Amino acid sequence: MTDPVRRLLLIKPSSLGDIVHAMPTLAALRERFPQARVTWLVKRQWAPLVEVIAGVDQVCSVSEGLRGWLGRVPDLRAAGFDLVVDLQGLFRSGAMARLSGCDRRIGFANAREGSSLFYTQRVAVPPAPMHAVDRYLLVAEALGATRPTQPRFEFVDRAEDRQAVETMLSRAGVAPHQPWVAMNVSARWETKRWPPQHFAEAADRLSQAHALPVVLIGGPAERAESLAVTALMRTKAIDLTGQTPVGLLPGLLRRASLLVTNDSGPMHIAAAVGTPVVALFGPTDPVKTGPYGKGHVVLSHAVECRPCFRRDCARAVPLECLTAVRPEQVVRAVEQQLERSQKPGSL
């Protein structure tokens, strides 16, 4: 008989979207091990998001670089974990699982960089393509959890966060209860970014045809992409890029009527909080990493080489899979989404 699990370490250091994908697995593990105290190991930049995920008892944040990771080993060993779940599946995460001193370590059999060698239990992944959310849930099932009919994404709903969001929107000119469209124009890969002129035209059309405020969001590193869009807009731009702490993103996107976005972390947060998404996909596969659940729209242009998962493009028409999606297609998708949405802002 397996000893009870009272101290559980979940390793999912990055990135924003992947952390969101792991939330239903956390919820399933909490049901499977209700007495367990759960610690989540995460990179420092994403720790504020994990702090607002329901069911996390402690956040163990790590700084960049080998020294930052190894500096956390004494803390992990002192915690005396009964079970370590590695959802990252890379050498560094597998090594941290082993260095934690825990005798029971689980991860994927096909984990990369040899990380599966550090596990005492390896979970097979079927060959057919599946969404990352469902793939992570395989680990919970292997540990005896019941697969949920409706995977749960639950953030802590804090009054101070709601107030901070309303204050931010009010200062930007968005009235309480006013419908608005969020727009995320950046992505980590350049090949995942819809052209700024397309975003600008879509924003102008929405503002002019429906008097919908379009609010650009993103982190400080995305300021240049947002400025490139606002410089091309003819209508008034509301740009909150760089002004939203990552821990407030769930509350901000919950307040939005809809999100127009590249394949990015905010896309997954919006889907998690129930906000409809219109997503632009180029080299990546929405079957594996698209907005999870029903009620979302993915737009892309069919070419024979997609999904290629490349960070460069050698086609005669560069990034045709993405750039061939026209602004009018996005506007039409937004209109259709808002018409059938139950969120405020139906047209």
Question: Could you say what each language-model-derived stretch is?
Answer:
Residues 1-347:
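Catalytic machinery of carbohydrate-active enzymes
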